[in-house]
Structures are given as C-alpha cells and as structure tokens.
Curated annotation (Swiss-Prot):
This is Increased DNA methylation 3. The lineage of its organism: Eukaryota, Viridiplantae, Streptophyta, Embryophyta, Tracheophyta. It comes from Arabidopsis thaliana (Mouse-ear cress). CDD domains: ACD_sHsps-like. Residues 169-199, 300-347 are annotated as: Disordered. It comes from the Eukaryota. Keywords: Nucleus, Transcription, Transcription regulation.
Length: 463
C-alpha cells in the first residue's frame, strides 16, 4: 500500500513511526524513569508544559543514526533516505489523507520541543531523551510482532551510546575510514539500497573506489591478453579500464600496489606508444589485482624485453632480484644517515616540527567552539578511540596509535626502521582546554579520513 504519490509504503511509515514514538520520550522531570511518547499515551499520563521539561536534547543526525541502527538488520528496501527522515522530523511528509497519519511533530510538538538550527550541519531537538529499553507491555501485540518481523529484532533493547553513533566502515587493508554511505542508489520514493551510513546521517555518494577495484579485478581476470603492456607505476596517473567496450573505472595508481621496478628509458617510450594505440584499455592497478596476474605480468615484462639492463657487475634485473642482498655501507655513510636533515618548503616551513600526534587548532564563535586535532595513525574503530568533554571546557582524547613500528613489511620485504620519528604504537591520552565552559550534550564530532579529528560544541549560555 502506498501512502502518497512518491511510493512510501505502509511498512516504511510504520517502522519510522514506531522507532520515533517508542525509542524517544520527553525529558519530563516527573517521569522517573523516563517514558516513551507512546508509553505516556498508553498510560494516560497528564500533559506537560515547558516548565516540566529538562534541558536534554538530541541532534537531527543522532535521530537519523538511531533510526538506521535500530533497523541495521532490516531489508534495505524498508529503509528511508535521510532526506525523507528529515521531512518526517519536520512534519512535512505529504501523506494522504492529510492529518490521518501522525508524524514526529505529533509526538513532540514544536511548541514544547523546539527544533533549533545552529549551522547547516548542526540542528537539535530540545527536551527529548533516548529510551534504550522500551516497555513492551504498553505496546499493541500486533504492532510489536509486526515490528519484530520487519526489523528482525527479537530484543528491543539497544545500547544508548552505540545507537546514536554513526555506523563507520573501516577498510582494514588501508586502515583508513571509508565513508561508504551505500552501495546503491536511492530510488524516487526515498528507499535506500544498503544499510551503511556515515557519521552525519546523510547519504553520500557510492564508494566509487570500491566499485572500481571490483571492476578492475573482473577486467583483469576476463581479458588478461589485453594487459600485456606495461602498467603505469607513477602515482597520480589516471587510466581508464574498459570491459566489453564500456568504460568501467578511472582511478589513481598507487606505487604500493605494484612491485618495485627500475624505470628504463626505452620502457617510457614504449609506454607512450602503447597508450596511444590502446587508449581506453589501460588498467590502473589496485590492491585487489590477483597475485597470479602480477607474477605473470612480472615474468612477461622481462621475457619480452629485447634488451635487459645490466649493472656494472653484469647482473640483469632478474638476476639481481634473485640474489637480492643488503648493500654494504661504510661506517661514515651510516653515521651521516643516522640523523637526516628535514627540509620543508611552502606552507610546511611555517610549522614547528614536533610530535605528529596532538597538534590542536581552536576556533571561537559567538555560540560555539570549534577544534581540530591531528591524530595520524590513530585507530578509529569502536572501543579504540574516545572523546570526553567536561562542562569546564576540558577535552580528553584517548586511543591507540598503529604507526611507528620497529619492523615493517612491504612488498614481501622486511625493513628495520633505524630512524623512527613517528609516535610508537600503543595507547595515548591527550588533554587540552577550550577557551570557556561548554554544554557537553551539544557536541558534534567528526573523525576525518585524513587523520584530523574535529568537533563543534556549543558554549555555555553564561560564557
């Protein structure tokens, strides 16, 4: 059944309405413990006014995160686009007939729970709290059974902190945060085709790099004979992988995705000729390229070379790699390389060299504070990183670093790090103070993929 012209189904409407009315409740002083909106209606509790409501509040992003976390096991066809959820929170969904279907503002009217917008990405709803364990005794049995069937949840209890947190994906192969909001597109009715969402609750573009890697791997397996040419090694060069006459992916080539080869002058010339001859069929390497293809490509490259480069000892490149031994250094050279000088130019020359972790920038606004902290190599997954803010403005960051190892394995080789300037791996704790007192409840964090942790927090009214 469709509730309006854009195709919102009754199941989709039922789920969003059930979650917002049973997992949220007004912050009424007399309700101890706090009750959900549906529970108050079922129990016939007296109405409340602004004088009875506490100072608790939730951001719109947290409400969206709550919706997606509760429906983490549901079918993707039942999930709504964040824009649709935002319209529901505002009471703007064009449901027909009008007034028959309650929306968020029916349970939390704006005259008692005002929605204030501090910035384009920071909007709060005042006077509401999360109910982590809804009382099922006050829920209609048919509605409860329908919700359990659609959400695939047997237990309605949730974790208060996790339910309001964004569902972050971590790409373990690169140890970087991937903001893969979805692997499909939102349809016209606002249905999302995946279950992964980013920290702001807003759906981003599909993870193009991940799709591209799959396309490249398929292209390599299906048509290996078209890949006999040399693959570009330089980072930043963009190529197009074409499969069955259609362009599949355009990505950035990374040095670490290939074995280390020595560039020969004739190789560079041959690359230019082959690129002109087979435009659109060159493949950019990815970490998902099959190992057997890389070995085949490696053997074919040296086999097809009409002239093998030799060093002064008469060893070819293949022979040198087979008999790869450490190059002896004189004691003077070792001493000179023990403490290399670091020369910086451009904007980097204006920075003060020091620890790579813990550099802080703080911004001040009339209503809020903004800070950025450099945390390169810090784990982002749950349980490994935490941020606590006290009312006096003290910020405490705790986590663990993954860089600075003594031995590093790259390209089937083990390197012993003689010079180590990065922070060693292990737990750390970082504390700094904001210029004034703040309201810890009104905090919007964001851990960026480039290793910068930033946050916006509302200042205390009296500060």
């Amino acid at each position: 059944m469709s509730l309006y012209s854009d195709g919102l189904s009754s199941d989709q409407y039922f789920l969003v309405n059930f979650i917002m009315s049973n997992y949220l409740g007004p912050d009424v002083y007399s309700d101890n413990p706090r009750c959900s909106s549906s529970q108050r209606l079922a129990r016939g509790l007296p109405p409340y006014t602004l004088m009875h409501i506490g100072s608790s509040s939730l951001t719109v992003s947290q409400l969206q995160n709550l919706y997606y976390n509760v429906l983490r096991n549901a079918k993707s066809s039942l999930l709504l686009h964040p824009d649709m959820i935002y319209m529901y929170l505002k009471g703007y969904l064009p449901l027909e007939p009008s007034g028959k279907f309650p929306q968020f503002t029916h349970f939390f009217p704006t005259n008692l729970h005002p929605q204030k917008r501090y910035s384009p990405s920071h909007e709060i709803v005042k006077g509401i709290v999360v109910i982590d364990d809804p009382a099922v005794g006050f829920i209609n049995k048919e509605e409860l059974q329908r919700f359990r069937c659609l959400s695939r949840l047997d237990d309605l209890k949730i974790d208060r902190v996790t339910s309001l947190s964004p569902r972050v994906n971590l790409d373990e192969s690169r140890e970087t945060e991937q903001d893969c909001s979805r692997n499909g597109d939102a349809t016209a009715n606002g249905v999302v085709t995946n279950e992964d969402y980013n920290s702001s609750g807003e759906l981003q573009e599909t993870c193009k790099r991940k799709e591209g890697e799959d396309a490249v791997a398929s292209c390599v397996i299906s048509e290996p004979e078209r890949l006999s040419g040399d693959i570009p090694e330089s980072q930043g060069m963009k190529q197009d992988c074409s499969r069955n006459g259609e362009s599949a992916f355009s990505g950035i080539v990374s040095d670490q995705d290939y074995y280390s080869f020595v560039k020969l002058p004739e190789t560079c010339k041959r690359k230019n000729k082959e690129e002109e001859a087979v435009t659109g069929h060159a493949v950019s390497g990815t970490s998902k390229t099959p190992e057997r293809f890389r070995e085949t490509y490696k053997r074919r490259r040296f086999k097809n070379s009409s002239k093998k480069a030799t060093n002064k000892n008469g060893e070819t490149l293949m022979e040198r790699e087979k008999t790869d031994k450490p190059i002896p250094f004189s004691s003077e050279m070792k001493e000179s390389d023990a403490e290399p000088s670091v020369v910086t130019t451009g904007t980097a020359s204006k920075e003060t060299l020091g620890s790579s972790v813990g550099v802080v920038d703080i911004g001040v606004n009339k209503v809020a504070y903004f800070f950025q902290v450099a945390l390169p190599g810090v784990r982002k997954d749950y349980g490994e990183f935490s941020c606590e803010i006290e009312s006096d403005g003290k910020v405490i960051l705790e986590g663990s670093t993954t860089r600075g190892e003594k031995n590093i394995k790259r390209h089937s080789r083990v390197f012993e790090m003689n010079i180590r300037k990065l922070c060693p791996p292990g737990p750390f704790k970082l504390c700094f103070n904001l210029p004034g007192p703040v309201d810890p409840r009104l905090f919007s964090p964001n851990f960026r993929s480039d290793g910068i942790f930033e946050g916006v927090i509302i200042r205390h009214k009296n500060s």
